[in-house]
């Protein structure tokens, strides 16, 4: 049973705050019973939804002036829930290869560019984990991907009270009011552990379910030796057990994941015949120029986030 269900089994409105179980890190958001009207439900709890949760926490905490005037936050804590299909928080867990580093600076974490005073900055994470001095001595802005995933897990742990894991959303149904306008949404989810179907009502919905692995034709969809990059670190241990064996491996694609897998195979399987198959004539570096980065940080890019927290009846799809 997920942590939230265990923590709040038998929950009633008569419970006092002191009756709540203690969380090691606890955000400013509070659990909302399923039968109450929510202000916001996020479908999926990856980096996009986590960033929304952090922004709402900072707004309630008063540490982020840019969110201080969002309607509704000054009078009460919003009723928010996050529904996640996975049994726990995970970010590209199948791609956490040894030695793989982030491609962007840690400054672009869950909070720093928006609110450097937030508890959820990568710097504060390092401080809390007694890793600040060690990381500073690395003389880099690019943390290991494994450490950055642990940072996001640490951030996610603050919101256990409002996240329901093992919940697969199967429908989002708009509900019209008497005048014909959409006033609320009905979010239907299935508990993957019990099979129970649950329904919640909300004024706003954010769809942040992430992408689905796609193995394109002509490759077979369910062949044991045709592996999508999102599952590589799991399955490679099963089908590439001998690091000295003369395997023949083809890596198809020209993105960052393909390049990292190719490099990993070349370094760890010296006798393997590994080929990188790409459509173009050469690999292209990612666009990390200052101009491109500035475009991503323009205020207009925050439209989805600000609209989601402003308590207007709406639905948004954001990348994950």
Predicted regions mapped to residue ranges:
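Short beta-strand to alpha-helix junction loop
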Residues: 134-154, 164, 313-320
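Helix-loop-beta segment of a Rossmann-like dinucleotide-binding subdomain
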Residues: 129-143, 184-188, 246-248
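Flavin (FAD/FMN) cofactor-binding and adjacent substrate-gating region
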Residues: 101-134
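A conserved short coil-to-beta-strand element within the FAD-binding core of flavoproteins
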Residues: 165-185
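N-terminal Rossmann-like FAD-binding beta1-loop-alpha1 element of flavoenzymes
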Residues: 31-81, 249-271
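Dinucleotide-binding/catalytic capping subdomain of oxidoreductase cores
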Residues: 64-69, 76-77, 90, 95-96, ...
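Conserved SAM/SAH-binding loop
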Residues: 166-170, 192, 231-232
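Glycine-rich dinucleotide-binding loop and its adjacent helix/turn
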Residues: 12-28, 198, 204-274
């Amino acid at each position: 049973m997920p942590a939230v269900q265990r923590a709040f089994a038998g929950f009633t409105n008569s419970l006092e705050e002191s009756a709540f179980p203690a969380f090691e890190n606890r955000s400013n958001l509070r659990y909302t019973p399923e039968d109450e009207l929510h202000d916001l439900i996020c479908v999926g709890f990856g980096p996009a939804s986590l960033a929304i949760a952090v922004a709402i926490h900072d707004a309630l905490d008063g540490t982020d002036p840019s969110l201080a005037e969002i309607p509704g936050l000054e009078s009460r804590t919003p009723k928010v829930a996050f529904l996640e299909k996975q049994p726990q928080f995970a970010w590209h867990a199948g791609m956490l290869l040894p030695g793989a580093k982030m491609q962007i600076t840690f400054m672009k974490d869950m909070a720093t560019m928006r609110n450097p005073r937030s508890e959820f900055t990568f710097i504060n994470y390092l401080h809390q984990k007694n890793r600040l001095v060690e990381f500073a001595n690395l003389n880099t802005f690019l943390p290991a991907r494994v450490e950055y995933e642990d940072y996001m897990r640490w951030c996610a742990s603050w919101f256990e009270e409002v996240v329901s894991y093992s919940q697969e959303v199967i429908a989002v149904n708009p509900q019209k009011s008497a005048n014909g306008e959409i006033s609320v949404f009905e979010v239907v989810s299935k508990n993957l552990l019990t099979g129970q179907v649950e329904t919640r009502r909300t004024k706003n919905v954010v769809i942040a379910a992430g992408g689905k692995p796609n193995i394109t034709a002509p490759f077979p969809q369910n062949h044991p030796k045709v592996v999508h990059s999102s599952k590589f670190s799991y399955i490679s241990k099963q089908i590439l057990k001998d690091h000295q064996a003369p395997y023949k491996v083809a890596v198809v694609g020209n993105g960052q994941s393909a390049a990292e897998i190719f490099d990993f195979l070349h370094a760890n399987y010296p006798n393997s015949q590994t080929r990188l198959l790409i459509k173009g004539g050469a690999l292209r570096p990612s666009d990390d120029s200052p101009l491109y980065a500035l475009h991503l940080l323009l205020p207009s890019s925050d439209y989805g986030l600000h609209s989601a927290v402003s308590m207007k009846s709406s639905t948004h799809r954001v990348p994950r």
